[in-house]
Structures are given as C-alpha cells and as structure tokens.
C-alpha cells in the first residue's frame, strides 16, 4: 500500500510567545529560542530522511522564518513556497497584544481558556479604526472587507483553512508531490480537527507545541492512517503542557 506523508510544523517560539501575549495576526518574529527550535525541526526531518517538493506557509514572518530555517537545514532553501493568509493564526481580536496570564487574572482562567481553545467562542472584536485591524495592512489589500476578521473563533478559522486544504494543498499531494506546511497553533489545530474528525470537546484539549514536526501518513485514498511527532516524547509532552498553561493566571 502506497503511503503519502505530510509534515506540519508550528512556528518556533515567537517573541510574544516568550512574553506570553496573544499574538493572532500581529506580525511578530521568532525569539532566539524559536530560531533554534526551527533549526532543530529541520535537523530532525533530515535525520529521518525527509525531503519535499513544495511548501506552504502563512503571510506572517514567524511561520515564514520557521520554514526558512527548516528548509535551510534540509539544504532545500530553493523549494517553491506558497504563502497564504488562509494559513494565518486565528485572529484574537481585541486581545491581541495582551498578556495571557494578566488577562486570566482579570477575566478568570476558564474565560481565557474558552477564548483560546473554545470551538465557537470569539474573543472581543476589534473596531475598524483600531490600528490592529488587518484592513490597515498592505499585505491584505486584495482581500474583501468580508474576508478581514475583527476577531475569530476556531470554527471561523476552520472556515478558511479547510477550503484551502481541499482546493489547494490536497490536490498537490494527490499529484505525488511531498508537502510541508509551516503555520500556527490554531490554523494547524483547525486542520488536525478536520483530518482526525475530532469533536469540539476533543479539540479544546489539543495543544500543538512550537517547532516540532508532526507527520501524517495517508492511505491511497488520502485518508489519515496515523500521525506522530518527531523527537523526544517527554520533551514534546512538556512543551504541549506549557502551551496549555499559558492562559492561566499566575
């Protein structure tokens, strides 16, 4: 049976991950640790014999720079790459820039958990005159006003990620090309929920660690057979737990 592999990588730690702030569509770069995580992901993939024909990422530099570092370690810096806003992180609305722990102290751990992980829960909206509104950013100039979020739930994130998967990424895989996606915690959670047919309760508890390759294997009908992280299992579990704890009051 022919097995097709797909690699997903959440960007390495960003400067705002380090500062425990809601990031969303804000274009913050990788921290030094994040660069190291991205390079380590590339080394792991090289050790396991991976190489790729095409890469996808978002239009946010923490994901783009993660992909650059991964491909550099694979000696595949030349690889064709498609960047799409549809792979962007979930938009956190008026929470963008706020410290997660301080927000939890103000609103409570459970409210912040729902804002971060709830399926259909949207954080408070931005207003269009807010400098954080994506309509002020030239990279989104070709998007319609309807496509520009004031805030997003995971459900709304799924509404943009999954059509991009089915219409753009999956056909390339079906043509025989080997694909890697470097994206974000929530855009990848959206894809994982779809691939694994997870319930809303199950996705609430899913935390994807930064800078760790997640491999999916598909059968000849492109149904997922299994998935697994590359690397030390204890270290990966600790990183996922750290992601879960970011939204708790100190």
UniProtKB/Swiss-Prot annotation:
Coiled coil: none annotated. It is an enzyme of class 5 (isomerase). Gene3D superfamilies: Phosphoglycerate mutase-like. GO terms for molecular function: phosphoglycerate mutase activity. Homodimer. It comes from Salmonella paratyphi A (strain AKU_12601). Catalyzes the interconversion of 2-phosphoglycerate and 3-phosphoglycerate. The keyword Isomerase applies. Pathway: Carbohydrate degradation; glycolysis; pyruvate from D-glyceraldehyde 3-phosphate: step 3/5. CDD domains: HP_PGM_like (cd07067). The active site is at 11 (tele-phosphohistidine intermediate), 89 (proton donor/acceptor). This is 2,3-bisphosphoglycerate-dependent phosphoglycerate mutase. It catalyses: (2R)-2-phosphoglycerate = (2R)-3-phosphoglycerate. Belongs to the phosphoglycerate mutase family. BPG-dependent PGAM subfamily. The record marks 184 as: Transition state stabilizer. One of its GO terms (biological process) is glycolytic process. Its EC number is 5.4.2.11.
